[in-house]
């Protein structure tokens, strides 16, 4: 059973937690929110025992093996790096980072700490995305006339 935490208490986090619960392989053990009241409200719905308003405290906790990051996009990279550097597996909502340099740094940090880094980017798995990939290319761009 993988013990995981969530950063963010929004609708997408709720969907992720419900899907993870259905798999029977994951247990939500910690919730982070800037507001203790928000964390408590979310935690009550899922019987979670560990609440955090400090990311550093959560990263240093022995209550989690992985974290699901669903915070505002601008925070994703810094939060990802924090947890990877504490040897905690990371599932991060898209976008993982704001540029290729940050993505490369996150990948390097995951490798260095021997943990999994996963960007939740479902669009690449959708049929219409595969159709776009199958279209002929013209130079470095696709053209539609």
Where are these regions (language model features)?
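N-terminal Rossmann-like dinucleotide-binding module
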Residues: 1-46
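Hydrophobic residues in well-ordered beta-strands that form the structural core
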Residues: 13, 52, 92, 117-119
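Short loop/turn motifs at secondary-structure junctions
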Residues: 25-27, 47, 63, 140-143
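Short active-site oxyanion
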Residues: 27-30, 65-67, 117
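Beta-loop-alpha module in the N-terminal Rossmann-like domain of NAD(P)-dependent dehydrogenases
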Residues: 46-109
